[in-house]
C-alpha cells in the first residue's frame, strides 16, 4: 500500500471535456470511505516490522482479514488458518479477538471525517458515508467562473466517462472527488491509514463504486454511468440494501438478476413483498437511493459474541457468558452510560442461515446502580439473570448443541437519568422504549464490527470470535416491526378530575391514566391493599408527592387529596407492582438473588396461562426462523419480565387481582383500615399516597413523626 501524496492524492487525473449540458439526476454528493484491510493496518501501525511481511489477523480458526502482501501469495479473507498456512508458510498470524484497538482507531477515523462534514454515518469499523453536498456548494460558490474549465477530477472516473464541466452535477462530483482525496490524505498523514473512496450522487452508488479500484484509490461515478454499474452486478444479492432473506424471496419469484428486478411487474412484487419493500428494492435496482446520511451519534447498544464449534453443557455456557459479560462491563465503564436491558442470543447447530433465538429482560435497579463503577460487583446477579434466560431457551436436561452465544446491553441511558433510587418504579416514564431507535437489531453471523449501524445487506462482512454491535438496524427491507408503546402525550389532560396534579398524572402508567380519565372501574373497590406485592423503597417519592400536594393545595384549597380509588390500584404488570400474578403474596426484596424474581414469574405465568403463552409474556423472544428481536417496553427496573397486554386486559386483570386478594387478605385489610384511623399524619402528607408506600417505609416515617412531635390529626379517607 502506497501512501497518498499531496496534490495528486496518489491517484490519476481524468481528462475533462466541455460539451452540452446533460440531465441532472441528483444534487447530492456522497462519499463512501472504505479502509483497506483495516484490522491488518492497525496491527502494522502497532508493529511496523510487520508492514512488508504477509500478515493475517486470526480469530478462532479463521483468517478474518490479511494485508495485500499476503493476498499476493494466495491468502484470502475468511480462509481457514490451516489452508492459509499451506498457501503461505511464511504468513505471520496475529490474534485479533480483542477488538479494543480496532474500535478505538475506528472512532478516530470517524472523528477525523467529521472535521470535513458533520454528516458522517458509520457503517461498521472500517466504513463511513460522508455527505459533502454543502461543502461542495460552498467551494463552487467561491470558485471564480474563469477557473471552472481548469477544474480537475482526482482519481478514476468509472467507465472512463468524459467529464462535462458545463454539467452542474459533473462539477459537483469533481469537487467532491477533490474533497475525498483530501480526506484520504488526512487519514494517512494523521492516522497512518489508507483507504478507498467512492464519489456518487447517493449512498447506494457510492458504496458500489468505491470498490471498483482497490487498494488506496478512489473512483467517481457520473450519473450517465449509473446503469452500467448496476448491471455489472452478477446477482441481486450484491445490491446493498437487499439482504439474504429478501433475495431468497425474490429468487422464488424468478428474480435473479438486476434486469429481472427492473422489469418485474411492480403490482405483483407489491403483492408478494408489500408496497413499501417492493417499491424500495425496485428503486435500488435502478440505482435510486434517497436515504440520507444520518450522523450515527453514540452507540445504542453494546454486544459481545462468541462463535465456537460446540457448546453442549450448562457449565460451558456459563463460562462463555462470564467471558462475554466481563468484556461488556469494561465497555460500559468506559462509555459512562448505563444499560437498562440485557439480551442473550444463542444459535443452535443447524444448516439454516438464520436460526438464532434471543431472550431479554430489564436489569433490576439495584444492579444498574453497580454498573460502571469500575468493579464487577454486578457480575453475579447478571450471570444469574442470563442463565435464567438461557434455561428458558435451552432444555438443559436434554442434549443440545450450540455454536454461538451473544450478550447484549441495550436501552442505554445517560448517567443523570440512570441515577434513580428504588422508588423510580412509581415514577417510570413510559416514553422510553426498550429500543431507543426505530431500526431493528440484527446480529450478523459474520460481523466483527462495533457500529452505530450494521452493514445493511451483508456488505463485506467478517466472521469473528466475537461480534460487537452497537445496536441498530439491518436493511429496512428485512427489518422486523416491533410493538410500540402507547403514547400518553395525546391524553386529554384538561379532562383530569379535580385534585389530580398534572405532573403527577403524567408519570403514572398509561393504563392508570386512561382509567382515571375514562373509567370508574375502581370506584367500587374497597380497602387500600391494592398492590399485590409491595416494593421496598426509599423516601424519595414521598417527598415528591408531598411537594406536589402542597403546590396543588395552594392553587386550589378544595383539592386536598388525590382519591385512592383513582390511583391506588394497579394491575399486576404495571409499574409499582411486582409483576407477580394476582394470587401471589410473595414479597421479594431487591437484595435477594435475581433468580427469585424469574422463578416466581415463571411459575405464576405457567400456572395461569400455560407454557406457550407464558414464554411469550416473560421474555422478549425471537422466532428462530425470523431471527428478529421483539422488545417490550421497560416499564420498571424492579420488574424483570413485563407481560404484554392490552388496556382492556389490564383493567380486567386489575379487577381480578383485587377480587382474588380479597378472600386471602380480608383480615389484613381490616387491620389496615383499623390502624388507619389511629395513624398520625402531618398536615402536608396525603394519607392516600402514604398507604401506597411499602410497609417498612410507613413504619419509618411514623417513627420519625413521633420523634419530631408532629401533630396527630385523624386521617380521613
Swiss-Prot record:
Effect of residue 7 to R: In strain: BALB/c
Gene expressing this chain: Poli
Positions of Mg(2+) binding: 34-35, 126
Taxonomic source organism: Mus musculus
GO annotation, cellular component aspect: nucleus
Catalytic reactions on record: DNA(n) + a 2'-deoxyribonucleoside 5'-triphosphate = DNA(n+1) + diphosphate
Polar residues bias spans: 607-622, 652-662
Alphabetized GO MF terms: damaged DNA binding; DNA-directed DNA polymerase activity; metal ion binding
Residue segments, region DNA-binding: 300-307, 343-360
Catalytic residues (UniProt): 127 (proton acceptor)
Main location: nucleus
Effect listed in the UniProt record for changing residue 606 to R: In strain: BALB/c
Reported impact of residue 694 to A: Impairs ubiquitin binding and post-translation modification via ubiquitination. Abolishes ubiquitin binding and localization to nuclear foci after UV-induced DNA damage but does not affect catalytic activity
Name of the protein: DNA polymerase iota
Post-translational events: Monoubiquitinated. Protein monoubiquitination prevents POLI binding to ubiquitin via the ubiquitin-binding motif 1 and ubiquitin-binding motif 2.
Tissues expressing the protein: Detected in testis, and at very low levels in spleen, lung and brain. Detected in round spermatids, but not in prophase spermatocytes.
Chain segments carrying region Disordered: 1-22, 549-589, 603-622, 644-687
PANTHER family, A to Z: DNA POLYMERASE IOTA (PTHR46404:SF1)
Outcome when changing residue 569 to E: In strain: BALB/c
Amino acid at each position: 500500500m502506497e501512501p497518498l501524496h499531496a496534490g495528486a492524492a496518489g491517484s490519476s487525473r481524468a481528462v475533462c471535456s466541455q460539451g452540452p449540458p446533460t440531465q441532472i439526476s441528483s444534487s447530492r454528493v456522497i462519499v463512501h470511505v472504505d479502509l483497506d484491510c483495516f484490522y491488518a493496518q492497525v496491527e502494522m501501525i502497532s508493529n511496523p516490522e510487520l508492514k512488508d511481511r504477509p500478515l493475517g489477523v486470526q480469530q478462532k480458526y479463521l483468517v478474518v482479514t490479511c494485508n495485500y502482501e499476503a493476498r499476493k501469495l494466495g491468502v484470502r479473507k475468511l480462509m481457514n488458518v490451516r489452508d492459509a498456512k499451506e498457501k503461505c508458510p511464511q504468513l505471520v498470524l496475529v490474534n485479533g479477538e480483542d477488538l479494543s484497538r480496532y474500535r478505538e482507531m475506528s472512532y478516530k477515523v470517524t472523528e477525523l471525517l467529521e472535521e470535513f462534514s458533520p454528516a458522517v454515518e458509520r457503517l461498521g469499523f472500517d466504513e463511513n458515508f460522508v455527505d459533502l453536498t454543502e461543502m461542495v456548494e460552498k467551494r463552487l460558490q467561491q470558485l471564480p467562473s474563469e477557473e471552472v474549465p481548469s477544474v480537475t477530477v482526482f482519481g478514476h472516473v468509472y467507465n472512463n466517462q468524459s467529464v462535462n464541466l458545463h454539467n452542474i452535477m459533473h462539477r459537483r462530483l469533481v469537487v467532491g472527488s477533490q474533497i475525498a482525496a483530501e480526506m484520504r490524505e488526512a487519514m494517512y498523514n494523521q492516522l497512518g491509514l489508507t483507504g478507498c473512496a467512492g464519489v456518487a450522487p447517493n449512498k447506494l452508488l457510492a458504496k458500489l463504486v468505491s470498490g471498483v479500484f482497490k487498494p488506496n484509490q478512489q473512483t467517481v461515478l457520473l450519473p450517465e454511468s449509473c446503469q452500467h454499474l448496476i448491471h455489472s452486478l452478477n446477482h441481486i444479492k450484491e445490491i446493498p440494501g437487499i439482504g439474504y432473506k429478501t433475495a431468497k424471496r425474490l429468487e422464488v419469484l424468478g428474480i435473479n438478476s438486476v434486469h429481472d428486478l427492473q422489469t418485474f411487474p411492480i403490482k405483483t412484487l407489491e403483492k408478494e413483498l408489500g408496497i413499501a419493500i417492493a417499491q424500495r428494492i425496485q428503486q435500488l435496482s435502478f440505482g435510486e437511493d434517497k436515504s440520507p446520511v444520518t450522523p450515527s451519534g453514540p452507540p445504542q447498544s453494546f454486544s459481545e459474541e462468541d462463535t465456537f464449534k460446540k457448546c453442549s453443557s450448562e457449565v460451558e455456557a456459563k463460562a462463555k457468558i462470564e467471558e462475554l459479560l466481563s468484556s461488556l462491563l469494561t465497555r460500559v465503564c468506559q462509555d459512562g452510560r448505563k444499560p437498562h436491558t440485557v439480551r442473550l442470543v444463542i444459535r443452535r447447530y443447524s444448516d439454516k442461515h438464520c436460526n438464532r433465538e434471543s431472550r431479554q429482560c430489564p436489569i433490576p435497579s439495584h444492579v444498574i446502580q453497580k454498573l460502571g463503577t469500575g468493579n464487577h460487583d454486578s457480575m453475579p446477579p447478571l450471570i444469574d439473570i442470563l442463565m435464567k434466560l438461557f434455561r428458558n431457551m435451552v432444555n438443559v436436561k436434554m442434549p443440545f448443541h450450540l455454536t454461538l452465544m451473544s450478550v447484549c446491553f441495550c436501552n442505554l441511558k445517560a448517567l443523570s437519568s440512570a441515577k434513580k433510587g428504588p422508588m423510580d418504579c412509581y415514577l417510570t416514564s413510559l416514553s422510553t422504549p426498550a429500543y431507543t431507535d426505530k431500526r431493528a437489531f440484527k446480529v450478523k453471523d459474520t460481523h466483527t464490527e462495533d457500529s452505530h449501524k450494521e452493514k445493511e445487506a451483508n456488505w463485506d462482512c467478517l466472521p469473528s470470535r466475537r461480534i460487537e454491535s452497537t445496536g441498530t438496524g439491518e436493511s429496512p427491507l428485512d427489518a422486523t416491526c416491533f410493538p410500540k408503546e402507547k403514547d400518553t402525550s395525546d391524553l386529554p389532560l384538561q379532562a383530569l378530575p379535580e385534585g389530580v396534579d398534572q405532573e403527577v398524572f403524567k408519570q403514572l402508567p398509561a393504563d392508570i391514566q386512561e382509567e382515571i380519565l375514562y373509567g370508574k372501574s375502581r370506584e367500587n373497590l374497597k380497602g387500600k391493599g391494592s398492590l399485590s406485592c409491595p416494593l421496598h423503597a426509599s423516601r424519595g417519592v414521598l417527598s415528591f408527592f408531598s411537594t406536589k400536594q402542597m403546590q396543588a393545595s395552594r392553587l386550589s384549597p378544595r383539592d386536598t387529596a388525590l382519591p385512592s380509588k383513582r390511583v391506588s390500584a394497579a394491575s399486576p404488570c404495571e409499574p409499582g407492582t411486582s409483576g407477580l400474578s394476582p394470587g401471589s403474596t410473595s414479597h421479594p426484596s431487591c437484595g435477594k438473588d435475581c433468580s427469585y424474581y424469574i422463578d416466581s414469574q415463571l411459575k405464576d405465568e405457567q400456572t395461569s396461562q400455560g407454557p406457550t403463552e407464558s414464554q411469550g409474556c416473560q421474555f422478549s423472544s425471537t422466532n428462530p426462523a425470523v431471527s428478529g428481536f421483539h422488545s417490550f417496553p421497560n416499564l420498571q427496573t424492579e420488574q424483570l419480565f413485563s407481560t404484554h397486554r392490552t388496556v382492556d386486559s389490564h383493567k380486567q386483570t386489575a379487577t381480578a387481582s383485587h377480587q382474588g386478594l380479597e378472600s386471602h387478605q380480608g383480615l389484613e385489610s381490616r387491620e389496615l383500615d383499623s390502624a388507619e384511623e389511629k395513624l398520625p399524619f402531618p398536615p402536608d402528607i396525603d394519607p392516600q399516597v402514604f398507604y401506597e408506600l411499602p410497609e417498612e417505609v410507613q413504619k419509618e416515617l411514623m417513627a420519625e413523626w413521633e420523634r419530631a412531635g408532629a401533630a396527630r390529626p385523624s386521617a380521613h379517607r
